[in-house]
């Protein structure tokens, strides 16, 4: 039984085309008036005719001018009644089923032109309520653009022409999505062998196996190539490249990248699974391509005997130093940006005495950023006088170790000239920095992935390879400040150790500046959120690093403006500039880091 209540007749809108007031469809011009689907379920009366029992009672339903319901009924309850819209839902509605499920979809519905429906569909197409997408295929009632509507019905359209086909080749690598406007499929005996041009996409078919073990089902009876099959299908083959469309094969290099991704995400077990799938389907696929994939998979397991690899990622994995391609792409973007950015040298002017207390405050703020919080007077006693509080010896050692590194003339000027030097310096400095925390494994790269606020840093087995290749990416960056920015991002993104990574990134970056006679970068507490936001902007893909460059340049400018000659004068100046203020409180109060001349 269906219970409904009526909407007042005065709410019927006019036909969008001829202006006359009719029901869901104007009988004079056959132009359908749109309905707005709602969770409560507003259905046009014509569609409910035959499903509504004899009497319709109840109060008039108020309406919103924005929804403009056509002469309609609101469904109050459904109890195993017949579907009001033929063909748009199952023959019987489940108890409590949502009415919105049966309402028109913005992408319309796909209709096949038969002898009985061809004339009607043609009239609808002329009236603008339907459009032809392929021979004998129409989309009716769509409010979306043709390209968007076709994207919604893509698998159904493919199934109309090639039932049981497989989304294969390059399309399998894109998860079934078009590549440069093309979809590639295979079918054992295609009835249509020419390309099918649809709005926004062209479907290209080739003769090939139907679904094989490991292939995954898709809507409308289609399948998509499984992990092993899609690797084989995308191996480069000899021959002239096609004209007017991309190659069906992504190429052996991308196949190697895919295998590297399998090994990275699932380890040796995932590689073994793909090999097992390959054994099960090898008789259905080209032997040469199967051999290439088998050799690459075996190489990941330690028995590669093939020729030179075309995939740098897979070659790096087989050499024992896989890397994070996503991070390298990030580093390339920053390197390009730095190459297009004019340098702004800021030499450390004045006598050495002017910078006497800079190392202490740098160490103090660097630890405070990481959560090792002491009052500045207490931190002075710890770092300078060697007074270690009994209740926090490890925290005190963090301050002492950082101060020792940044105040030493040699370690404060570390500027690695090669990737090997960078790796050695990182390990050596980490041993000093975390000497009081043996549980953090000083000097040893991490064995578990680390996170910050849900953001995942480079995986442990990719750290060395990413550091090496990232250092090479930045080899073209020669300006000291720009190189400091680059190494800051490189070390931060890799996060190579269990702890102490932020302090190490700042130490190495400042070492590059000191070695070139430039002003170091101090990040006071009030500026912490700006600093982290600059790093997060690059991590999250919000630009190539523009905000990070701006943040670090201002911090360097601020550092150059402070007089670091005596503790008392420096402390008084920093307090006047609100440098010790909690960053959250500062943001809430509208306070920001200021230069001395701005006070």
What are these regions (language model features)?
Residues 44, 55-111, 118, 127-132, ...:
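FIC/Doc superfamily catalytic core
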Residues 10, 21:
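Flanking scaffold residues of small Cys/His-coordinated metal-binding clusters
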Residues 22, 33:
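Cys/His-rich microdomains that often coordinate metals
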Residues 2-6:
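Short, intrinsically disordered terminal segments enriched in charged and Pro/Gly residues
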Residues 137-142:
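Minor-groove-contacting beta-hairpin "wing" of winged helix-turn-helix DNA-binding domains
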Residues 13, 24-27:
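Cys/His-enriched microdomains
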Residues 18, 29:
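Short Cys/His-rich metal-coordination motifs, predominantly Zn2+-binding knuckles/fingers
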Residues 150-161:
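Short, structured active-site "lid" loops
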């Amino acid at each position: 039984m269906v219970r409904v209540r009526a909407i007042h007749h005065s709410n019927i809108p006019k036909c969008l085309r001829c202006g006359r007031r009719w029901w869901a469809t104007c009988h004079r011009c056959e132009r359908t008036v749109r309905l707005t689907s709602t969770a409560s379920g507003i259905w046009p009366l014509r569609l409910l005719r035959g499903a509504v029992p004899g009497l319709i009672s109840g109060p008039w339903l108020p309406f919103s001018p924005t929804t403009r319901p056509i002469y309609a009924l609101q469904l109050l309850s459904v109890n195993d009644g017949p579907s009001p819209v033929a063909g748009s839902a199952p023959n019987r509605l489940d108890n409590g089923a949502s009415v919105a499920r049966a309402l028109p979809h913005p992408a319309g519905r796909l209709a096949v032109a038969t002898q009985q429906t061809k004339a009607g569909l043609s009239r609808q197409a002329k009236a603008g309520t339907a459009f032809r997408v392929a021979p004998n295929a129409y989309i009716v009632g769509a409010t979306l653009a043709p390209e968007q509507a076709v994207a919604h019905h893509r698998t159904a359209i493919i199934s109309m022409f090639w039932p049981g086909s497989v989304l294969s080749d390059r399309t399998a690598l894109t998860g079934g999505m078009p590549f440069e406007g093309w979809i590639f499929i295979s079918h054992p005996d295609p009835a249509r062998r020419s390309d099918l041009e649809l709005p926004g996409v062209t479907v290209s078919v080739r003769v090939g196996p139907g679904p094989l073990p490991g292939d995954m089902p898709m809507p409308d009876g289609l399948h998509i190539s499984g992990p092993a099959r899609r690797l084989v299908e995308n191996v480069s083959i000899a021959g002239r490249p096609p004209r007017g469309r991309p190659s069906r094969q992504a190429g052996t290099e991308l196949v190697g990248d895919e295998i590297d991704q399998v090994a990275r995400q699932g380890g040796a077990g995932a590689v073994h699974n793909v090999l097992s799938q390959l054994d099960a389907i090898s008789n259905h696929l080209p032997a040469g391509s199967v051999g290439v994939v088998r050799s690459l998979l075996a190489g990941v397991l330690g028995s590669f005997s093939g020729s030179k690899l075309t995939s740098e990622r897979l070659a790096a994995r087989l050499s024992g130093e896989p890397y994070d391609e996503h991070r390298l792409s990030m580093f390339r973007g920053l390197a390009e940006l730095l190459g297009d950015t004019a340098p702004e040298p800021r030499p450390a002017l004045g006598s050495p005495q002017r910078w006497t207390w800079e190392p202490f405050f740098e160490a103090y703020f660097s630890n405070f950023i990481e959560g090792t919080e002491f009052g500045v007077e207490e931190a002075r006693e710890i770092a300078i006088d060697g007074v270690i509080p009994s209740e926090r010896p490890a925290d005190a050692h963090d301050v002492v170790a950082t101060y020792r590194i940044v105040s030493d003339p040699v370690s404060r000027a570390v500027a690695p000239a090669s990737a090997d030097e960078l790796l050695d310096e990182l390990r050596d400095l980490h041993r000093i920095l975390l000497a009081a925390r043996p549980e953090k494994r000083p000097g040893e790269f991490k064995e578990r992935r680390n996170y910050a606020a849900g953001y995942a840093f480079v995986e442990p087995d990719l750290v060395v390879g990413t550091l090496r290749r990232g250092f090479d990416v930045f080899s073209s960056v020669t300006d000291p400040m720009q190189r400091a920015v680059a190494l800051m991002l490189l070390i931060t993104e890799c996060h190579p150790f269990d702890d102490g990574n932020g302090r190490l990134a700042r130490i190495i970056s400042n070492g590059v500046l000191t070695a070139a006679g430039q002003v170091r970068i101090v990040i006071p507490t009030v500026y912490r959120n700006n600093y982290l936001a600059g790093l997060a902007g690059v991590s999250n893909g919000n630009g190539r690093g523009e905000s990070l460059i701006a943040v670090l340049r201002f911090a360097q400018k601020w550092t150059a403006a402070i007089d670091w000659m005596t503790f008392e004068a420096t402390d008084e100046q920093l307090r006047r500039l609100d440098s010790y203020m909690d960053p959250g409180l500062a943001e809430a109060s509208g306070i920001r880091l200021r230069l001395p001349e701005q006070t």
